[in-house]
Regions:
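Extracellular glycan-recognition regions
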Residues: 1-170
């Protein structure tokens, strides 16, 4: 028994139909008024952008949950139509303000891009991968698969029918 791996069911799905945000969701700092809404579009979490970024250690727009296992599969669907080149949206694998990985959608000119960036302690933020999303229609599913300390990242532009490999990190 001792040599067998032990697993806890940490499966979690949130369809955002409750009037209140589930307590499994967390914020980096104390949530400010009008940070998010569950009422604007029932069944969806609406996150409002803030002018701050992760690096400046101020309150930025982030709602997340803690990673509880080293082996997991994670998917999140995001609806986002960038209209302003100064705003981006996506997911973040966050350890601290000085150590994180982002996968975000943004607009540059008339093109839409998915870019993955890595920030490590005492290092500058670097772009790992940048992909032009020619078939982006305002909806994307981000997928992360973690096995034995290796993270593999995918995305889908067809509601999860097909996933495209983005990158891997260990």
């Amino acid at each position: 028994f001792a040599e067998k791996p032990q697993y806890i069911s940490n499966s979690y799905v949130d369809d955002f139909t409750s009037k209140n945000l589930n307590l499994k969701w967390t914020f980096i700092r104390v949530p400010q008024n009008k940070t998010y809404s569950l009422n604007v579009n029932p069944g969806y979490l609406r996150l409002y952008p803030k002018p701050n970024t992760i690096e400046n250690r101020k309150n930025f727009s982030l709602i997340g949950f803690r990673q509880k296992e080293s082996d997991f599969d994670y998917e999140v669907k995001m609806n986002y139509k960038p209209s302003d080149e100064s705003v981006e949206s996506g997911i973040i694998h966050y350890q601290k303000e000085r150590n994180f990985l982002t996968s975000t959608i943004y607009k540059a000119g008339k093109k839409i891009f998915l870019e993955q960036r890595l920030k490590e302690k005492d290092q500058k933020l670097v772009s790992l991968k940048k992909v032009s999303l020619k078939k982006y229609n305002g909806s994307i599913i981000f997928k992360t698969v973690s096995r034995k300390d290796e993270y593999t990242f995918y995305y889908s532009l067809d509601d999860g029918e097909n996933f495209t490999y983005l990158s891997s990190l260990d």
